[in-house]
């Protein structure tokens, strides 16, 4: 829903899966005065035209700063579009000013409230994986790795948005439980629990491969990542060596129910630099781009990729 231009960043940089495959993201392409004067009929006409040209199961109107500033009524846009096309329309009232995971949180809720309506018979062997995006897990093979881990337990992983599509969302009520792998998906898991009674747990099934074999005994360790991944790494370290002292930090969404008292939120680079300078850490787990920020750190730095931080994936 941007006035024109911002979509290039999304398609060209923010979604690494589109480096190798087609996407179906369109800019509203409106002139300044169209946006300011609220000529919504032109946006509706463009959406209907795009829907006629591609094979789509639904359309989503996603907000950016300009429509946020002029007070765009997304629900009205949704109703106008649904009258002109047979496609279901989602409206996600993002404003382009929050961090990426806030938009993810709204998108998950919009998807499940719109499409997960029918109650199916529960299959205990199926496990829903919520929060699986390249921005959060930083590995395009992560879904396959999680599937392999759960297969060892006789379970089938349903990775919403990373291999499993709209049909899986529609049948979300049939999974025996959900596993939340990013904080952005927590509200979606709560919605599914409230609506269908589906229990959820928080963690990352493939966390073991993120923790190298090091001497963790008595070590003070800092883990910087999105909150659930950081917590999963902490639990994996403590499982191997419970004498370690592990603190987590994140640049992004931080849910109180997932945090320990010593965990911190980071806003500026100086926050991270000061934390490392004064923390006395022996080992740091963080994206490699953050190693240069602390040149005086004398301990072990473990490269733990976070695509949302560096724009780089696990190799």
Model-identified regions with their sequence ranges:
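An N-terminal assembly and electron-transfer interface module characteristic of large anaerobic redox
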Residues: 1-315
